[in-house]
């Protein structure tokens, strides 16, 4: 999972809920990674740790076109940083897939030849179906994860400017709620 924000952590919880044994979340914010770790996820600060080595320690090894890599089948981009797609293409195992959740303005380059040789799949994700909402409710009712722990701040509607500023501070905030 690329991105330890609200969407990344929620997607990681979904992966665990639907049966993934191991889920690793990577981000550049130690604050957010600590929140993810407290929820039981393996973490990697890929701004200073070797992501491939960390992932191999969690998932084991698998073949790729470029040698041994992490035995991870699913990658999710919940961060939207420009190099993520290229990073996936360089380290994704054969027949792995990348789901893009984070929206980034403009076009993103894809090496279609590499995608073909590695048998990678690139999947877009947008919107919800009624059954998705039912799944989210089931996860919340289950109370297996302390989902409320990702709420770091609450503001009144009159404090919306401060709330937006706080939400942009990834080293001190994760999920900022505005009460109205």
Indicate where each model-derived feature is located.
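Mid-domain Rossmann-like dinucleotide-binding core that forms the NAD(H)/NADP(H) cofactor-binding site
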Residues: 1-49
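Residues in the short beta-alpha loop(s) of Rossmann-like NAD(P)-binding domains
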Residues: 28-29, 104, 128
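Structural detector of well-ordered beta-strand residues that form the stable sheet scaffold
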Residues: 24, 97-99, 123, 177
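C-terminal hydrophobic helical "lid"/dimerization subdomain
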Residues: 86-90, 130-180
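Glycine-rich cofactor phosphate-binding loops and adjacent beta1-alpha1 units
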Residues: 34, 39-121
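Structured loop/turn residues at beta-strand edges in well-structured enzyme cores
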Residues: 18, 70, 74, 145, ...
């Amino acid at each position: 999972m690329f991105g330890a924000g609200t969407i990344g952590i929620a997607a990681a919880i979904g992966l665990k809920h639907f049966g993934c044994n191991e889920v690793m979340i990577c981000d550049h914010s130690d604050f957010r990674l600590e929140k993810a770790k407290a929820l039981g996820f393996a973490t990697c600060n890929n701004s200073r740790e070797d992501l491939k080595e960390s992932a191999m320690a969690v998932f084991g090894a698998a073949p790729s076109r470029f040698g041994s890599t992490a035995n991870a089948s699913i990658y999710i981009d919940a961060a939207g940083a420009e190099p993520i797609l290229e990073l996936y293409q360089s380290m994704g195992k054969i027949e792995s897939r990348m789901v893009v959740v984070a929206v980034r303005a403009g076009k993103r380059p894809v090496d279609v030849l590499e995608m073909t040789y590695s048998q990678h799949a690139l999947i877009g994700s947008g919107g919800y179906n009624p059954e998705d909402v039912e799944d989210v409710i089931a996860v919340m009712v289950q109370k297996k994860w302390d989902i409320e722990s990702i709420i770091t701040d609450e503001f009144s509607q009159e404090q919306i400017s401060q709330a937006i500023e706080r939400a942009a501070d990834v080293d001190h905030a994760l999920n900022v709620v505005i009460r109205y």
